[in-house]
């Protein structure tokens, strides 16, 4: 494919991006273009829509689906950043062309197809006390504005932890000794990922939790999968609990991965354990997730959740 055609594809992709997350919507209701990463019930992952703060809640409307989180249910809001693909379907077509193109021109097009976005992570509770994280990508600079508006509307935020943590690997810790037994319980409760003494962005921890809930449910291993804090779990006599703690974290670069195919990988290692009601450790394992080539950095959490869900199903 020649350079002229590559330039045309890039122009189409970037034009689409300008109409999408690259620019906030301008109207009286302060609607903002957003992409749903994960966490909203009945909303497809990576679907796009309009984000509005109105009538005491955060509303996401995509196509015929509208979901609203009441500000009173929100207990924390975090802002992160991500580098993602611009241009929607046009961007996908252009990126495919870049792969087939000569190395130098394909790499240049990959750079043009990158755009930085804010990642809005909204922690909230359902009517049963279950913990949810809604993760949304918005145009750069819109995340803090949405956070401020939600706080003004009555949303709660947690105080800063004050921890001075660094990306890397935690101090070596021994895995707990697990009882050799099959996991035959009818239900399991998923707890949010603990950071330990490793720095990891809030959106990674939140996405890990949401993907774990989704993947463990899809595995069919347990009749019931409860979210952290769900009061209904208290009535299950054989309830198990899944704990995860970050053991190491390396945030790579999506653009570097796609240009070089060698460098820029994102990796997360966690210590995963399953305990019974008496606190006995039934399963303990160190698991690693990674994104080596295509995909946003947050994709590492989905990979990690797949590995853990598969391990649980084998027991």
Task: Indicate where each model-derived feature is located.
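Bacterial N-terminal signal peptides that target proteins for export
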Residues: 1-10
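Bacterial N-terminal signal peptides
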Residues: 9-18
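A structural "domain/chain start" motif
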Residues: 22-48, 160-218, 251, 284-289, ...
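Phosphoinositide-binding peripheral membrane targeting modules
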Residues: 54-96
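Extracytoplasmic/secreted envelope proteins and their assembly/folding machinery
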Residues: 55, 71, 143-147, 151, ...
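Second-shell loop/turn segments in exported
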Residues: 62-64, 132-138, 193-203, 259, ...
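Acidic, Ser/Thr- and proline-rich intrinsically disordered linker/docking segments
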Residues: 78-168
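Surface-exposed short loop/turn segments
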Residues: 81-117, 228-278, 295
């Amino acid at each position: 494919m020649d350079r002229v055609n590559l330039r045309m594809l890039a122009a189409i992709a970037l034009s689409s991006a300008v109409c999408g997350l690259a620019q906030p919507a301008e109207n009286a209701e302060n609607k903002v273009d957003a992409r749903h990463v994960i966490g909203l019930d009945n909303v497809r992952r990576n679907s796009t829509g309009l984000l509005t703060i109105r009538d005491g809640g955060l509303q996401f409307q995509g196509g015929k689906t509208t979901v609203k989180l009441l500000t009173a249910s929100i207990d924390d809001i975090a802002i992160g950043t991500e580098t993602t693909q611009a241009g929607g379907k046009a961007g996908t077509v252009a990126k495919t062309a870049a792969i087939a193109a000569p190395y130098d021109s394909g790499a240049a097009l990959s750079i043009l197809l990158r755009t930085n976005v804010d990642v809005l992570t909204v922690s909230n509770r359902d009517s049963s006390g279950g913990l949810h994280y809604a993760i949304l990508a918005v145009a750069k600079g819109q995340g803090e504005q949405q956070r401020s508006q939600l706080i003004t509307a009555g949303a709660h935020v947690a105080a800063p932890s004050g921890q001075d943590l660094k990306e890397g690997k935690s101090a070596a810790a021994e895995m707990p000794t697990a009882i050799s037994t099959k996991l035959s319980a009818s239900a399991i409760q998923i707890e949010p990922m603990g950071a330990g003494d490793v720095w990891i962005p809030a959106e990674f921890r939140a996405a890990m939790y949401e993907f774990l809930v989704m993947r463990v449910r899809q595995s069919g291993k347990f009749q019931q999968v409860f979210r952290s804090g769900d009061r209904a779990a208290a009535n299950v006599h054989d309830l198990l609990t899944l704990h995860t703690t970050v053991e190491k974290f390396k945030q790579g670069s999506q653009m570097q991965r796609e240009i070089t195919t060698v460098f820029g990988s994102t990796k997360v290692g966690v210590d995963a354990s399953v305990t019974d009601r008496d606190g006995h450790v039934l399963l303990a394992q160190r698991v690693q997730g990674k994104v080596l080539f295509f995909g946003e950095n947050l994709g590492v959490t989905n990979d990690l959740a797949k590995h853990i869900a598969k391990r649980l199903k084998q027991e």
